[in-house]
Every structure is written in structure tokens, then in C-alpha cells.
């Protein structure tokens, strides 16, 4: 399971991580999620609460989980979350 800090950082997208119907979640800009369903179909969801501050906090939390650093001078990070979800972050500092 996820610890409280990780669960809080993932809260805005948790509803899309839990169902096994999604094979990929892409966030290319704040407030917009793109979801790939296992059938290969894509959908876009507007999620205003997924703002820049929330995304940055998620990236820092994910990096900390695996002993990496995510900062303005190091804005690229790849890791796996507990549960095996792959995360790739390229920050827009």
C-alpha cells in the first residue's frame, strides 16, 4: 500500500490509477489528463484541481520515494511507484 504522503500526492489522479481499465495516464499540462484504455481508445479529462503546484508536489514525492531528486536544476525524473506504475516527469521550470 501507499503511505499517507504518497496517497495525498496521488489523490487527484487516484481514481484513474485504481481501475485496471487504463493502461496509460498522460499529463502534459496542468489540468488535463489523457487516458488510454486497454482497448487502445483515448479520452481527455479536464481536471482543474491538477494545477502546477499539485503536479510539482507529486513529482517531488515520487522522486523521494525512490531516492531521487526533483528540483528546478534537475527537472527530469523516472521512477516506479509502489504497485509498479511507471512515472516519467519532465518539468517545465
Task: Give the role of each language-model region.
Residues 85:
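P-loop NTPase nucleotide-binding module
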Residues 89:
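Conserved hydrophobic/aromatic pocket- or pore-lining residues that grip, position, or stack substrates
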Amino acid at each position: 500500500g501507499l503511505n499517507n504522503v504518497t496517497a495525498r500526492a496521488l489523490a487527484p489522479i487516484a481514481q484513474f490509477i485504481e481501475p485496471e481499465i487504463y493502461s496509460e495516464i498522460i499529463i502534459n499540462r496542468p489540468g488535463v489528463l489523457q487516458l488510454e484504455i486497454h482497448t487502445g481508445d483515448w479520452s481527455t479529462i479536464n481536471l482543474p484541481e491538477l494545477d502546477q503546484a499539485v503536479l510539482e508536489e507529486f513529482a517531488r514525492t515520487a522522486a523521494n520515494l525512490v531516492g531521487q531528486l526533483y528540483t528546478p536544476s534537475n527537472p527530469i525524473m523516472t521512477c516506479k511507484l509502489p504497485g509498479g506504475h511507471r512515472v516519467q516527469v519532465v518539468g517545465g521550470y
